Design a protein with these regions (language model features):
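A short alpha-helical cap/connector motif
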Residues: 3, 8, 17-18, 22-166, ...
Length: 242
């Protein structure tokens, strides 16, 4: 059983930033605002059956992640992966920065949507994931479009001399504010920022939850909500986005 994560999308138009929170809520934690639904319910099966398929390679990667890797629920999965591909196909970025590769599922989904000149730089700080993730990225049809880097994006990106059209934040929740600030610095005008897990299993509304990760996500949400360049729209993705 696995759950779809939360996702936020930021779009930069001139000096204006528009932020959308696309979210689904995990069944792992009670939340008074939303009914929890895992991808084992009839409705979830209907959603999957009526969405574009992920393809055999991504399916095998997702299965291998669940068999071989600790905390496999961190992988994006079918529906979020199709959304990422859809957004990339629509936005048409030339350079994508991903912070938090995990096993490469999301990077490969985004790579599917890239044009001929598109390239993804994806960073992962957990070096124990390197062999598994590099094997799956290098074995894919999109290996030439994905630059997989082990290391801290906060330290390496400023040394790269690159600009990005799109940034996907899915790394250490404690560092989300730093990732956001860095993303804005290296994002071209008209670029997009996506941030995953912005509801953090519903913990963001639980006042008793004061752990570093929950606090990091809250700080990010508060920052973008109060940034005068940002408009915030919360959309219940699981209720129906085709």
């Amino acid at each position: 059983m696995f759950d779809l994560p939360d996702i936020a999308v930021v779009s930069v138009f001139h000096t204006k930033i528009i932020l959308f929170h696309f979210f689904v809520v995990s069944s792992q934690t009670e939340c008074v605002m939303f009914e929890r639904m895992s991808l084992t319910t009839p409705l979830d099966k209907y959603i999957a059956d009526h969405s574009s398929p992920e393809g055999d390679y991504l399916y095998r990667l997702f299965r291998a992640t669940h068999v071989e890797i600790l905390a496999p629920q961190m992988a994006s999965g079918h529906i979020q992966g199709r959304l990422l591909k859809f957004l990339v196909s629509m936005i048409k970025p030339k350079r994508i920065l991903e912070i938090g590769t995990f096993t490469g599922y999301s990077a490969l989904c985004m790579a599917e949507g890239l044009g001929e000149e598109g390239l993804i730089y994806t960073f992962e700080v957990e070096d124990e994931l390197e062999d598994f993730t590099r094997r799956w990225i290098d074995g894919s049809d999109y290996a030439s479009k994905v630059k997989f880097i082990i290391g801290d994006a906060l330290e390496i990106v400023p040394t790269m001399g690159e600009r990005f059209d799109m940034v996907f934040i899915d790394g250490n929740k404690r560092e989300y504010v730093k990732y956001y600030e860095m993303a804005l610095e290296y994002l071209d005008e008209g670029g997009w920022i996506l941030a995953d897990n912005t509801l953090w299993d519903g913990h963001v509304i639980e006042e008793e939850r004061q752990d570093a990760q929950t606090s990091g996500v809250r700080a990010f949400n508060d920052l973008v909500r109060n940034d005068d360049r940002v408009e915030v729209v919360i959309l219940p993705l699981r209720v129906g986005l085709t």
